[in-house]
Amino acid sequence: MSLLTEVETYVLSIIPSGPLKAEIAQRLEDVFAGKNTDLEALMEWLKTRPILSPLTKGILGFVFTLTVPSERGLQRRRFVQNALNGNGDPNNMDRAVKLYKKLKREITFHGAKEVALSYSTGALASCMGLIYNRMGTVTTEVAFGLVCATCEQIADSQHRSHRQMATTTNPLIRHENRMVLASTTAKAMEQMAGSSEQAAEAMEVANQARQMVQAMRTIGTHPNSSAGLRDNLLENLQAYQKRMGVQMQRFK
C-alpha cells in the first residue's frame, strides 16, 4: 500500500458515511494526484462543509496544507488553528512539545506513527497545530504518520461507540437504529438508481421503505416491528443491481 493510499484510508475512516464522504474522498484523490492545486479554494470549501466536527476539519486542513504546493506567505486558516489547539489545555501543549521532539528524530512514516500512538488525541492534535503554525518542522512523511495515528485513535473510539450501540439490548434503541439504517439504505438506492427507466422499480421500493419508516415513527410501533426491514431493502437493492448488471458487495 502506498503512503498516500494509507493516509487516505485513515482520514476517510473518521468521516461519517454519506454523500459528503464521497465528495471528500474525491477531493483527497485529486489532491494526492496533483490535480487540485488551489489550496485557498480547497480550504474555503472545507470550512463551509456541514456535519464534520472541528477536529475532522482541522485534520483535513492539515493534510491539504501538507500536500498542496502553496506560496510561502499563504496565511494559516483560523478554523484549522482552533481545531488543533488541544482544547486550549496546557497539558496537551506540554505533551505535544515532547512528542514533537521525538518526531524530529524519526524519518519514516511508520516510525512516527508508532511513536505518536502512545499519546492522547488532544496531544496529537496540539502537535499537528505546532507544525501547522510553522512553530516546528518535520518531514511530510513524519507529519502523515502523526495524522494517521490521530485518525486511528478517533476511529477506535468511534468503533467502540458503534459496537456499544450494535450490541445494546435496549429494544427501543435497536428499533430506532434499524429504522435509521433502512432510511439511509433507501437513500442510497435512490442515488444509485439515477434516471434510467429500470430505476423506477428501485425508486418505488425505496419510497415505500421511507413511507413505512415515517409511519412507524409517527404512530409509534412495537420495537420488533422493524426487524428485517433493512434486510428486505438490501435484497431488493441486490436484485435491482443484478438486473442492471452492477455488482456491489452487500453493504451490511
Swiss-Prot record:
GO terms for molecular function: RNA binding; structural constituent of virion. Residues 1-164 are annotated as: Membrane-binding. A motif (Nuclear localization signal) lies at residues 101-105. The keyword RNA-binding applies. One of its GO terms (biological process) is viral budding from plasma membrane. It is a peripheral membrane protein. Residues 165-252 are annotated as: RNP-binding. One of its GO terms (cellular component) is virion membrane. Most abundant protein in virion. When expressed alone can form virus-like particles in transfected cells. Homodimer and homomultimer. Interacts with NEP. Binds ribonucleocapsid by both interacting with genomic RNA and NP protein. May interact with HA and NA. Cannot bind NP without genomic RNA. Plays critical roles in virus replication, from virus entry and uncoating to assembly and budding of the virus particle. M1 binding to ribonucleocapsids (RNPs) in nucleus seems to inhibit viral transcription. Interaction of viral NEP with M1-RNP is thought to promote nuclear export of the complex, which is targeted to the virion assembly site at the apical plasma membrane in polarized epithelial cells. Interactions with NA and HA may bring M1, a non-raft-associated protein, into lipid rafts. Forms a continuous shell on the inner side of the lipid bilayer in virion, where it binds the RNP. Determines the virion's shape: spherical or filamentous. Clinical isolates of influenza are characterized by the presence of significant proportion of filamentous virions, whereas after multiple passage on eggs or cell culture, virions have only spherical morphology. Filamentous virions are thought to be important to infect neighboring cells, and spherical virions more suited to spread through aerosol between hosts organisms. This is Matrix protein 1. It comes from Influenza A virus (strain A/Duck/Hong Kong/2986.1/2000 H5N1 genotype C).
